[in-house]
Amino acid sequence: LQQWQKSLLRHRSPRALRRLLLAFRSVLSSHDDEVQHAFHVQDSRVFSKLIITTLKYMPMVMEYHVPYKKTADGRFKVQTHTQKWHVLQRPVRSYFMSVIKLLQTLPEADMVYVALNESAKMVPYLHQDRRVARDYVRALLGQWSSGEDRIRLAAFSCLYVTCLLYTSPSPR
């Protein structure tokens, strides 16, 4: 995990990002006993560290390789016709599917709050996959309908940013 962190900080490495996402997905699916996963974590501190590392470093690496611009009306513009986007499109989908699973299964309010705040930074990259966006909005609505006030506010903030992707610009 420390090697991946160093590689992500120094080089913004997509290879280290893919390994980190594979570990993230494996940890979240570890309760499935019939499926063999590439990574297995038994310590709760390592589990928390892996989740927080993935949530914090994924937006940083994506912003480096595929930066987005915010337009005057608040919408996001992502350069999707680049080679880097085609390489990182599947990891973005994997990230959101794992975050959805995390939001549905995580009982700790602090970790849910971190997951909501960090996943909001990745929402501009969600525009290509409407099914994942729909599932993400459902998970956000689930968090908004239950939980404490700061989680409700974070979920509403994520919903607002997600709605900016799919609403038409206002007429002038």
Model-inferred region functions:
Residues 166-171:
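Conserved small/polar residues in nucleotide/adenosyl-binding loops
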